[in-house]
């Protein structure tokens, strides 16, 4: 395991005794994480879960004027376009308004340890290309609520792709503490990659969190979570996990009440990247703790990378074939023997990246 060095201003992961005077702030990030496949087939994903996601969130966007929804995975947007074109066109209006937010930057929410650097960059490139062509926007973050560990190269790759932040909730699934007494280095800070480039890191907590029609500005748990950092800020997922859909009506109403409330917590109905943008440029915020290392899971993550070895073998063989095809195509064009088959290569990579999904390549799906 790579050595991990934690560099914190104040010297403690949570800096409990170094809270700032400012009011606690909660970035409420609505999501409906949808597995491309897991305990069901892709046909079920498209017929039930993709439909539920777009239909339910269009309803919430119409009903609640402050509701902001975040959703990741270019392949799921492509399925929306193919199978639910009327709803897709309606969704585009809310994307233009900034209320349906494109998160994650990628073609799919792939595993974050097995794929090569080339695969990572292709995944981001193809995702961003789709978002530009379809919606006229680009994503700015890595949004992986449900992956099983994150390599030290991830912040370097993200930074070189022009991205500014990363979030997940999965490290809470660790069985044993890893960073002192904690399962993660801190809840909000900077993550430094192997070349020294940094992105912002935010721990999102449980993505299936729900509330029952309360004023979240008065919520004691949000206040306590915000107090775990010297920033007095919490980044909080809420919604559903794995099967898509949407947050509950009561949860959305709780955020709406919090926005109007006068309690000790300032509520923000946030896009997945708003926190990162609020702290740019990062060099102006020396109070941000810095982590320099990898973010791994123990029991759960270990099984993902020691089983279904054949799938990992086929993955690597396809990465090598993709590299060979790219070299051959570029050489042929350079020699004026053939036109570079960009569309063919991109479509092949999309089909391949689809199988690098974090429950596919790891062997954790049926």
Residue ranges and their predicted role:
Residues 11-15:
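Sec/Tat signal peptide C-region and signal peptidase I cleavage site
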């Amino acid at each position: 395991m790579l050595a991990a060095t934690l560099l914190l201003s104040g010297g403690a992961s949570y800096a409990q005794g170094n809270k700032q005077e400012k009011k606690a702030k909660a970035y409420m990030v609505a999501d409906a994480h949808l597995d491309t496949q897991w305990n069901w087939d892709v046909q079920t994903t498209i017929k039930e879960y993709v439909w539920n996601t777009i239909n339910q969130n269009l309803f919430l966007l119409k009903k609640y004027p402050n509701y902001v929804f975040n959703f990741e995975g270019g392949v799921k947007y492509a399925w929306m376009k193919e199978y639910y074109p009327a709803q897709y066109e309606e969704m585009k209006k809310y994307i233009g308004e900034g209320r349906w937010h494109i998160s994650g930057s990628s073609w799919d929410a792939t595993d974050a340890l097995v794929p090569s650097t080339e695969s990572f960059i292709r995944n981001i490139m193809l995702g961003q290309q789709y978002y530009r062509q379809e919606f006229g926007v680009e994503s700015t973050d890595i949004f992986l609520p449900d992956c099983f560990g994150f390599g030290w190269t991830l912040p370097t790759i993200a930074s070189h792709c022009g991205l500014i932040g990363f979030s997940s909730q999965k490290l809470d699934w660790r069985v044993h503490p890893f960073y002192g007494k904690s399962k993660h280095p801190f809840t909000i800070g900077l993550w430094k990659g192997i070349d020294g480039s940094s992105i912002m890191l935010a721990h999102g907590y449980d993505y299936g969190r729900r509330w029952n029609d309360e004023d979240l500005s008065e919520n004691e748990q949000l206040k306590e979570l915000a107090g775990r950092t010297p920033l007095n800020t919490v980044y909080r997922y809420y919604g559903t996990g794995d099967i898509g859909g949407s947050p509950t009506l009561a949860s959305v109403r709780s955020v709406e009440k919090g926005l109007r409330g006068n309690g000790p917590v300032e509520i923000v109905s946030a896009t997945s990247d708003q926190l990162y943008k609020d702290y740019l440029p990062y060099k102006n915020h020396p109070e941000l703790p810095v982590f320099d290392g990898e973010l791994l899971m123990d029991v759960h993550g270990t099984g993902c990378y020691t089983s279904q070895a054949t799938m990992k073998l086929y993955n690597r063989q396809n990465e090598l074939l993709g590299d060979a095809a790219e070299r051959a195509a570029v050489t042929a064009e350079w020699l004026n023997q053939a036109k570079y088959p960009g569309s063919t290569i991109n479509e092949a990579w999309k089909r391949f990246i689809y199988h690098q999904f974090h429950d596919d390549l790891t062997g954790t799906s049926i």
